[in-house]
Amino acid sequence: MGEFKPPLPQGAGYAIVLGLGAVFAGMMVLTTYLLKRYQKEIITAEEFTTAGRSVKTGLVAAAVVSSWIWCSTLLTSSTKEYADGIFGGYAYAAGACFQIIAFAILAIKTKQMAPNAHTYLELVRTRYGKIGHGCYLFYAIATNILVTSMLLTSGSAVFSDLTGMNTIASCFLLPVGVVVYTLFGGIKATFLTDYMHTCVIIIIVLVFAFKVYATSDVLGSPGKVYDLVREAAKRHPVDGNYQGEYMTMTSKSAGILLIINLIGNFGTVFLDNGYWNKAISASPAASLKAYAIGGLAWFAVPSLISLTMGLACLAVETSPNFPTYPDPLTSFQANSGLVLPAAAIAIMGKGGAVASLLMIFMAVTSAMSAELIAVSSVFTYDIYREYIDPRASGKKLIYTSHVACIFFGLAMSGFSVGLYYGGISMGYIYEMMGIIISSAVLPVVLTLCSKDMNLVAAVVSPILGTGLAIMSWLVCTKSLYKELTVDTTFMDYPMLTGNLVALLSPAIFIPILTYVFKPQNFDWEKMKDITRVDETAELVQADPDIQLYDAEANDKEQEEETNSLVSDSEKNDVRVNNEKLIEPNLGVVISNAIFQEDDTQLQNELDEEQRELARGLKIAYFLCVFFALAFLVVWPMPMYGSKYIFSKKFFTGWVVVMIIWLFFSAFAVCIYPLWEGRHGIYTTLRGLYWDLSGQTYKLREWQNSNPQDLHVVTSQISARAHRQSSHFGQVDEII
């Protein structure tokens, strides 16, 4: 057996983990300051979790792609391509892409029914009370724990393999930078770092693709790769593939992976509050487009990286440059995620190892930041605000969010160390997740899509489903392999059985329990009872001249409520500052701008928003059906049944299509967000120039003249509109 020796020194691992972590943390701290100074983005409790509910399409799409690029997206897809052939990588990508597009339906429904929500668990609590809330709290937290532990175990393993870095150290050090920038910038920092990480990953994937298929001295063309992979099939044919070929989509193991992936990833998308955070943070106009674009853009990443590095590993395994030459990778080495770095090292030397390491670092940290926000928002709004201090101020809630981020980061580092010592791999957690959590998928969907499902069905069906799934998984393992070990429970058929039972069994339980215990006939209007956090005290503390009541209307009730949230010293500061003013300062301008539109205008805007969401929902249903057929039926099934072995021309065409698709992804999530945000980028850079050149007065003049362009104004107008529309009674018409 060839030994895989670390191609890079330990210092490289620590430099990337600590150095890049510090760089990103510093960049986000600086960015948070710049946005506060030039765009008036003030990090309140609401802003920390929802980013003002106004994030545009491109940035949300980039964040969706980044959150869905796990280590397994890069490593497992390449491993499956290496083990099962060309269908392996496609099965991974198609099995995990559809859920993102389908989630657009839930994103739109959340915007329609509960525009003030912070987590999907708030919707569950509103509908089913504390019992239902407690049940789904378990599934939400379990999802975050499983996803984060998989990220840390896989990331630390790769750093150890490529640099010799201590695995325990990497488990604890990888989250440090992520926690720091998440604490300072909240979900907006997550969006921005997700964007940067996505750009880096896509660039590296394109570098690998052009190196393998165009410029490499070892390979250099699709035809050369094709010939070498066909030769590899003669040396070690694939069990379960037609004629043992890698260049066929008739693959039993890859077909099983497609089903397991499809089932398991419904849970990791629909039950992970991180995706709901992004949906809630998106502007209403972005809800559909962001998830549709994000899903399609993401598909190209695992498809092309596996098509490139999985097949390249097969093609170069007889090259003297291969890390384990003259032996190929063992199954243990391949399953440990070494396919991608082995191919990169063989083709690009140490540069390939560095690129692999950088890509894995980006995948771990970007996905983990989303998990931190997901857990902190659940802990803050579904535990602390609900059960500990229902009248907590925004300041207390943001402090709670910070504590939750730190605690979860530390806890997951410790848990990942335990998994490492227990010998549990990334692949094992990835395939096992669906067994644990997927029974809650259908009940969550029906919580938003059906009036009839009652409390008993909502609570009992996922619990029964999880129990039956675990039992089926273990019974199948015992009956087929006569013993229960990590290796036997990781086999294809037990994993397939457990995942199928988990996802599908609630489809039997829910109708029965709903019929026996009577349909609920839920009133969707109750979803409007979910409220936003009052940001008054936090905004006044940031700028004492901001007043969040309509002074012109002299609304005494609102003014008294606002004043009750502001300390006497802050009131005195406001009075003293106002006495000094000759002209209205920025705080007063902001206050006036927030109340510039009357209630009728706001209601008309909300009506149009609801109509736009209703149109988007119809399109989302169509896209869901279309892409389900395209990705899961129309392309793979005929190719599987025909037993077609790719010709050289067909394979070349497939490579070209995937490269073009990734260029589309690059445009959608790297260039388009810059275009959408060009005005904000320009005004921020211009304000920075004015400050650095001693012309700060111009910044003040611009902000006073254009309050409608300031984030605090747009977010507070939205908050005011939805606060005053709690009586809006058209929800039943749009569901």
UniProtKB/Swiss-Prot annotation:
Topology Extracellular: residue spans: 36-85, 152-166, 211-253, 317-343, 425, 476-496, 640-650
Origin: domain of life: Eukaryota
Ranges annotated as spanning the membrane: 15-35, 86-106, 131-151, 167-187, 190-210, 254-274, 296-316, 344-364, 404-424, 426-446, 455-475, 497-517, 619-639, 651-671
Keyword Transferase tagged: no
A Pfam family that the UniProt record links to this protein: SSF
UniProt-recorded Gene Ontology molecular function terms: putrescine transmembrane transporter activity; spermidine transmembrane transporter activity; urea transmembrane transporter activity
Keyword check for Transmembrane: yes
Family the UniProt entry places it in: Belongs to the sodium:solute symporter (SSF) (TC 2.A.21) family.
Protein name: Urea active transporter
Species the sequence originates in: Saccharomyces cerevisiae (strain ATCC 204508 / S288c) (Baker's yeast)
